[in-house]
Swiss-Prot record:
Organism: Rickettsia prowazekii (strain Madrid E)
InterPro entries, A to Z: SAM-dependent_MTases_sf (IPR029063), UbiE/COQ5_MeTrFase (IPR004033), UbiE/COQ5_MeTrFase_CS (IPR023576)
Binding site for S-adenosyl-L-methionine: S68, D92, N120, A121
Function of the molecule: Methyltransferase required for the conversion of demethylmenaquinol (DMKH2) to menaquinol (MKH2) and the conversion of 2-polyprenyl-6-methoxy-1,4-benzoquinol (DDMQH2) to 2-polyprenyl-3-methyl-6-methoxy-1,4-benzoquinol (DMQH2).
One GO term (biological process): methylation
Catalysis: reaction(s): a 2-demethylmenaquinol + S-adenosyl-L-methionine = a menaquinol + S-adenosyl-L-homocysteine + H(+); a 2-methoxy-6-(all-trans-polyprenyl)benzene-1,4-diol + S-adenosyl-L-methionine = a 5-methoxy-2-methyl-3-(all-trans-polyprenyl)benzene-1,4-diol + S-adenosyl-L-homocysteine + H(+)
The protein's annotated pathway: Quinol/quinone metabolism; menaquinone biosynthesis; menaquinol from 1,4-dihydroxy-2-naphthoate: step 2/2; Cofactor biosynthesis; ubiquinone biosynthesis
Protein known as: Ubiquinone/menaquinone biosynthesis C-methyltransferase UbiE
Enzyme Commission identifier(s): 2.1.1.163, 2.1.1.201
Length: 248
């Protein structure tokens, strides 16, 4: 096999998924708290904006790299409040994270019409043309082979199905860019050490963000996977971006 990036380090492709799994297993219990602290709560607003990309909740939705379930559970609550007939599958390769999502769904009484499946984004255990929406938030950056995951997304979506991705991106404005770089590399790992007892995990986080393709480059990757009507929308000056596309 070939070497790939694990943060700024080069590792064998076959080892990368294990390394990432190990990181998320170690920080799973502090994951939600760290998201609030690192983003100063902004991730909640980003996710609220993200779910606006899924207008039809009478749908079959696959949420990949679900983590602790924030996106899927927001959709489940919205559908429940509206009386929609939603069908949700939460999928993550990390069982500890998925177990946290299960617990949250029970605590929030949102477990109806939800399935939890441990699965690899590069090899999804679903039939072709199965879902109306494929959602992934802050997850595709951690997939060893992003192109393979995009092709799997295309495969499992129904014709006219929608791909929606929320991911950290590239800040272009000068002052914000400089501040964001300083905050990412100097503050976030320190918060990770204090709160989660794991500086290394959050060093990986900021390094993986720095290496992720720009908005335009990722748009090209999505299009080359077969999608059409590929667009992105920057939030918070490009700290994150929402990418959307259709299988036509």
């Amino acid at each position: 096999m070939y070497n790939t990036n694990f943060g700024f380090k080069k590792v064998d492709y076959t080892k990368k998924q294990w390394l990432i799994n190990n990181i998320f297993s170690r920080v799973a219990d502090k994951y939600d708290l760290m998201n609030d602290l690192m983003s100063i709560g902004l991730h909640r607003l980003w996710k609220d904006e993200f779910i606006m990309q899924i207008p039809n909740l009478n749908s079959n939705i696959l949420d990949v790299a679900s983590g602790s379930g924030d996106i899927a559970l927001k959709l489940a609550k919205k559908a429940k409040d509206r009386g929609n007939n939603i069908s949700l599958i939460l999928s993550d390769i990390n069982e500890e994270m998925l177990n946290n999502a299960k617990k949250k769904s029970i605590d929030l009484n949102l477990f109806q019409n939800i399935k939890f499946i441990v699965a690899n984004a590069e090899e999804l255990p679903f039939s072709d043309n199965s879902f109306d929406y494929y959602t992934i938030a802050f997850g595709i950056r951690n997939v060893p082979d992003i192109n393979k995951a995009l092709k799997e997304a295309y495969r499992v979506l129904k014709p006219m199905g929608k791909f929606v991705c929320l991911e950290f991106s590239k800040v272009k404005e000068g002052i914000l860019k400089d501040f964001y770089k300083f905050y990412s590399f100097n503050i976030i790992p320190s918060i990770g050490q204090i709160i989660a007892g794991n500086k290394e995990a959050y060093e990986y986080l900021v390094e993986s963000i720095a290496l992720f393709p720009s908005q335009d480059d990722f748009r090209i990757m999505i299009k080359e996977s077969g999608f059409e009507e590929v667009h992105y929308k920057n939030l918070s000056g490009g700290i994150v971006a929402i990418h959307s596309a259709y299988k036509i």
